Structure formats: C-alpha cells, structure tokens
Amino acid sequence: MKIKSFLWILLFGVFCSNSMAELPKVIAHRGYWKTPSSAQNSLRALELADSIGVYGSEFDVWLTKDDVLIVNHDAVINGMDIESSSSKMLLKQKLKNGETVPTLDAFLNRAKKLSVRLICELKPHKDKQREAVKRIVEMVRKKGLEKRVEYITFSAEGLLELIEQAPKGTPVYYLNGSRLPKDLKSIDAAGQDYHINVFRRHIGWIKECHDLGLKVNVWT
C-alpha cells in the first residue's frame, strides 16, 4: 500500500507555527496500525510509525489498580476496567496482532531504539490522576526520553499536573476543545490540540494562538 493512500488514516496532528514556511507535521494516531501485523497502541505500530518517517507516534496511558502503567486507548479491555483491575490480568490480554497489551515500560524500551517523537496521551482517571502523572513523568525521565516526549490530555486536572510535574519547557497540549488561547498561555501549556470542528467554529483561535507563541494541533 502506498504511503499516500494511508496517511489520512494516521493524521492526528497538524502542527503550525508563526512561520508559514514550516510544513505541517503528521502524527500517527495510536501508531501506524492500519496494516497487516499491526494493531492500535502495539509495539509494532510504534515501530512502523518510526519507519515511515512521521513526526510522532501517539499512544494512550492508564494506571492500573496496582499502579502499573499500561498502554491502551479504551478504559476497558475485554470487559475489564483498567483502573479497577490488576495488571496481572490485564497484561494477559491480546491485541489484534497477537501481541499482549504493553506496559509503558516495555513501550518506552522499544521507543529508545527508534527516533520518532513520542506523543503521550494521559487518559482521564477517576481517582488517581496526579499519581498517574507522577509515575509517567518519572518513567520517562528514567528512560532518558524527556526530550522526545510531548504530552496531550482531555483532563483539565491532568493538564495542570503535567505542566507542573514535567520538566519546564516540555510541550503539553489540551485536547478538550474548551479553553481559550489566552487561558492556555497563562498556565504555560504549549497550545491547543482540538478537533477540526472546534476550529471551524472558532477560526480566529488559530491566529490568536500564533500571536501568543502557541502551537496549534488539529485532529479529525
């Protein structure tokens, strides 16, 4: 399959800057998984995203009941709620390509062998949002990947925690589509990371972000 035919599947973010000469950058949403032998948020999807030269590979992180960080999009795996389940049971679950659900530890170990930027989505947790952020940031530090990681989240609490706990200057974007550019600037967020329909309703936000030195990401 030609790259042109599947890039739209991978389009997660369009990164803009004050310089119109800078080309948009593409992020593989949950990795490059729309291909045989791959699956969403799998190690293979991460490797394939790296192989096609996209800017970054996005992945989703949860904290289990016994405080293990795992990579998965949904809050539930085969009927088991991640936040209230033990890692022992969750890590036995298989992805569509036969891999087991990866821990963040395993995911970052594989990432260390690659060069693609890592776009870590902190999932909204019911009770342990601060603890999840603490453990994610610490693991990224221990793996020596701080300069390659950017964070995104739908959680208002998680956004503030990431900005507070991650090293100063680490890009942290808000996904929820509700905060004004000036509000994000005031808390040192990197910019807006909103669905395309949000920008259709608020087209002026793009210029406002750029005028404030913020970046704009678009997903569909």
Annotated model-derived regions:
Residues N18-T220:
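Phosphate-group recognition and catalysis centered on beta-loop-alpha active-site segments
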Residues I3-S5, R30-G31:
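Hydrophobic alpha-helical segments, especially transmembrane helices
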Residues K2-I3, A21:
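Terminal accessory/targeting
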Residues K4-F15:
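Sec-dependent N-terminal signal peptides
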